[in-house]
């Protein structure tokens, strides 16, 4: 199937996907804990019968059962050397079941490993894992691909890049969302569709997670930005335990009724996930088969995105600032740090610029004496772990920009592409491949344009070249090419003409490097501010500038208000209130309209975020305390030891630091996580930062006879090989002073209970991601009672609920790692 054929199919009517595979195979006798792919190959008739029933029910696309047949997943069962044969045979089984009446999609999913910097799996290694599997699936004859049940946008990117480097088959991508409407890593539905459609996905949507009703709102969010079809594959409700069996209550008729609402909301491709059967798909086909298809947007919006937020660049929208400070040019202290391999100042600059109102951050690592490419990658990892803002990748080297775009977990802005041969022939296709926007720099191999007519010609030619490879005006921002007024008295007037031409004739947004205009002049801030105000009036959309310059920023806010831009009066008043409080010494962080939810944090520690960048010269203990607190709050793992040592030098004891600063900081992180202002990356980053501090202080605590609070045994239950959530629980509990015995994943009930009794553990913590392994938790609870083990049992996992915990007799349930600590504290306080 070609991508064009896929688009034609989806544009003609709602396309029906199949329903659940795993839950139906389990009903047919597949045991818990086996490798599903191997069991299918040993029992091929079961899969063929199920998928034939789906085809009879009206399915247009079957998912081949290659879901966990990647090298990383197969290694869990010692089957990695069977990868090629297994994927070939699994695709063949589905093609046999389809019988030419349905298409077959090769199915990829998450690996269960954490990507760097949260884990040890490098992005390029993950791309290779997906490429290996995708190549086999493509050669086996799959018609298209689906990347499904994804929790991480970055893993989605790796899979799409891998498939695109192997073949040009259609790609559908589907993520899972929590009740709060975000993925586990904090990505909202709109951001996901913006990033993935720009990267080359042919359809984007969501699956699993919830029942169909809860998917309507996320679908509507996606539909506002989607230029490709949307898909939905909901569960048949949430799983419940009935007489020891996991059941899904949503009937085929109920499922089909809400399925019709999903199609009305914008879904063009629809099927079922956990708990659905051929009967659900048959009812769905009857309900939606003749409904009109919601057509995606024909005109793209100018969108940039990080992993957790998106911003829109509008011709008549609010003026935007690209923070310029992360650039070593002229910054001797930053240059010295970069030569030492430190990115502490980069973190601080990112945080300060976000808090001062920048909407995008420019990253430039151009200097002698360092590996610029590696430093660019390290800076991107550091900044994306610190702030939510989208990035502008700034380098004069094509290979550095390509490396940065490849690993950036969002949709970036490239700074810049000119008509120079290297840029237009090599960098432009790279920007297209990775779905980036770019700054159009009106230069050619002949140098600066001689006049406006030549500049206009270069702009038109670069636009033509971009359109020839599938890009458009929505992917471009034009640089006004600001010259120094000291050398060219008409420099400002020429820029104003360019801004006006781009906005009014070309319908293109514009940007400029603001400070160039005043180079060599005294009191440059006045010149810069006057130029900015006049430039905005002539159509300038954004500027690369220092957002900490209050005069400049205030002029931008005032200019927007005078031009009567939407909500400009509210933004101006908010800005003035923020400055008033700031100048009165109040600790306050301003979050301007349109920035990321939770991008900045109000409070004592957050108000001093800039202090986390380096150790203090002062011996003041209060200052040291705030720095320790803030380092944990901001996840500054590379500098926490400097702050802890400074606190010790200032007179703090190890106990003071842990109980007075580290634990309060991680408590605040947990509260921010509960409020959905922090997400999994920030939680892990802060927890790892605290771990560094605890490990440093532990020997000192041992000398003072400090004992652990209690012993706990934690494990992922038998048959379940997922451990991301469990690992985070272990990390958090250790940070709070508990002695944790981590038994790992796929752990039998006997070993869990035996270990708890041998170690005199007071709590057993159980994790399960899959609905098929939930019942193993009940086995542990029953064995605890049978053997007279006194440990409390607490449980958690994606499909686990409070009612399930009560039904199996567990002592408690927590939805996440932060809540688990509170639960354990409460249980032990009662004893």
Task: List the model feature ranges, each with a label.
Residues 1-479, 483-831:
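Domain-level signal for soluble alpha/beta catalytic cores
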């Amino acid at each position: 199937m070609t991508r064009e054929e896929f688009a034609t199919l989806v544009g003609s009517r709602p396309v029906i996907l199949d329903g659940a595979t795993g839950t139906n195979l389990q009903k047919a006798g597949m045991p818990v804990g086996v490798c599903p792919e191997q069991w299918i190959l040993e029992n091929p008739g079961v899969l063929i019968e199920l998928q034939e029933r789906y085809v009879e029910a009206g399915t247009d696309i079957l998912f081949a059962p290659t879901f966990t047949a990647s090298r990383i997943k197969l290694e869990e069962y010692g089957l990695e050397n069977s990868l090629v044969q297994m994927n070939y045979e699994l695709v063949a089984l589905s093609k046999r079941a389809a019988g030419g009446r349905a298409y077959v999609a090769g199915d990829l999913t998450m690996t269960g490993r954490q990507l760097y910097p949260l884990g040890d799996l490098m992005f390029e290694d993950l791309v290779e894992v997906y490429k290996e599997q995708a190549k086999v699936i493509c050669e086996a004859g799959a018609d298209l691909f689906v990347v499904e049940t994804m929790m991480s946008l970055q893993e989605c990117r790796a899979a799409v890049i891998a498939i695109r480097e192997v073949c040009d088959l259609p790609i559908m991508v589907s993520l899972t969302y929590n009740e709060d409407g975000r993925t586990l890593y904090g990505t909202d539905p709109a951001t996901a569709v913006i990033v993935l459609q720009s990267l080359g996905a042919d359809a984007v949507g969501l699956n699993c997670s919830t029942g169909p009703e809860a998917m309507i709102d996320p679908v509507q969010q996606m539909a506002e930005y989607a230029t490709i079809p949307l898909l939905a594959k909901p569960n048949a409700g949430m799983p419940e335990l009935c007489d020891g069996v996991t059941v899904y209550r949503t009937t085929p008729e109920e499922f089909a009724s809400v399925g019709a609402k999903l199609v009305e909301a914008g879904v063009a491709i629809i099927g079922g996930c956990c708990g659905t059967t051929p009967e659900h798909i048959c009812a769905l086909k009857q309900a939606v088969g003749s409904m009109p298809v919601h057509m995606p947007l024909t005109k793209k919006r100018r969108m940039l995105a990080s992993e957790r937020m998106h911003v829109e660049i509008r011709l008549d929208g609010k003026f935007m600032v690209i923070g310029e400070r992360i650039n070593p040019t002229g910054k001797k202290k930053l240059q010295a740090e970069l030569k030492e391999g430190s990115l502490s100042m980069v973190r601080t600059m990112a945080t300060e610029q976000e808090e001062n109102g920048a909407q995008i951050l420019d990253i430039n690592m151009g200097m002698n004496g360092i590996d610029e490419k590696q430093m660019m990658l390290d800076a991107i990892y550091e900044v994306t772990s610190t702030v939510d803002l989208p990035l502008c990748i700034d380098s004069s080297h094509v290979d550095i920009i390509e490396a940065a775009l490849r690993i950036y977990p969002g949709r970036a802005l490239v700074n810049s592409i000119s008509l120079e041969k290297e840029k237009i022939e090599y960098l432009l296709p790279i920007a297209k491949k990775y779905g980036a926007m770019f700054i159009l720099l009106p230069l050619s191999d002949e140098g600066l344009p001689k006049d406006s007519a030549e500049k206009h010609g270069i702009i038109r030619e670069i636009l033509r070249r971009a359109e020839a490879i599938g890009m458009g005006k929505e992917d471009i921002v034009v640089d006004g090419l600001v010259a120094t007024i000291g050398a060219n008295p008409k420099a400002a007037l020429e820029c104003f003409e360019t801004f006006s031409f781009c906005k009014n004739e070309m319908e293109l947004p514009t940007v400029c490097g603001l400070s160039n205009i005043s180079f060599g002049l005294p009191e440059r801030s006045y010149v810069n501010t006057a130029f900015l105000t006049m430039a905005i009036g002539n159509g300038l959309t954004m500027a690369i500038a220092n957002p900490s310059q209050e005069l400049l920023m205030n002029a931008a806010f005032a200019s927007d208000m005078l031009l009567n831009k939407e909500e400009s009066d509210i933004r101006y008043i908010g800005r003035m209130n923020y400055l008033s409080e700031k100048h009165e010494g109040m600790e306050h962080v301003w979050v301007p309209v349109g920035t990321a939810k939770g991008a900045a944090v109000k409070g004592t520690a957050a108000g001093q975020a800039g202090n986390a960048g380096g150790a203090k010269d002062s011996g003041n203990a209060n200052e040291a305390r705030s720095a320790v607190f803030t380092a944990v709050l901001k996840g500054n793992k590379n500098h926490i030891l400097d702050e802890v040592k400074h606190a010790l030098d200032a007179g703090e004891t190890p106990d003071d630091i842990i109980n007075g600063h580290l634990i309060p900081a991680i408590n605040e992180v947990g509260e921010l996580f509960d409020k959905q202002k922090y997400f999994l990356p920030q939680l892990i980053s802060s927890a790892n930062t605290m771990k560094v501090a605890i490990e440093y202080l532990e020997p000192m605590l041992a000398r003072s006879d400090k004992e652990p609070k209690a012993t706990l045994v934690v494990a992922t239950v038998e048959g379940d090989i997922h451990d991301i959530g469990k690992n985070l629980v272990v990390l958090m509990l250790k940070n709070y002073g508990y002695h944790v015995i981590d038994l790992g994943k796929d752990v039998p009930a006997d070993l869990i209970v035996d270990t708890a009794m041998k170690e005199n553990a007071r709590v057993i913590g159980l994790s399960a991601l899959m609905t098929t392994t939930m019942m193993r938790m009940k086995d542990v609870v029953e064995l605890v009672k049978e053997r007279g083990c006194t440990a409390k049992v607490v449980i958690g996992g994606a499909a686990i609920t409070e009612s399930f915990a009560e039904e199996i007799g567990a002592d408690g349930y927590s939805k996440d790692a932060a809540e688990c600590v509170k639960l354990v504290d409460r249980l032990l306080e009662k004893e």
